[in-house]
């Protein structure tokens, strides 16, 4: 896989995580929201690192 491919996958993951967080928020699931916030932050950090390589 190339760096642009990995960036595309990370962007897709970020979009999915954001949608899941919106759903968890509408259900009032604070625990799941916190988990997703962590995953979103990790994915954003990965994206930043990948963008630094490209």
Place the predicted regions along the sequence by residue.
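Short amphipathic alpha-helical heptad-repeat segments
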Residues: 3-20, 39
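Short, charged, amphipathic alpha-helical segments
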Residues: 8, 30-41
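Generic leucine side-chain signal with a strong bias for well-ordered alpha-helical environments
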Residues: 14-17, 36, 47-50
């Amino acid at each position: 896989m190339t760096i642009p491919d990995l960036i595309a996958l990370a962007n897709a993951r970020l979009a999915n995580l954001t949608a899941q967080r919106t759903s968890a928020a509408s259900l009032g699931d604070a625990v799941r929201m916190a988990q997703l916030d962590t995953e979103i932050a990790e994915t954003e950090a990965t994206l930043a690192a990948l963008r630094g390589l490209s």
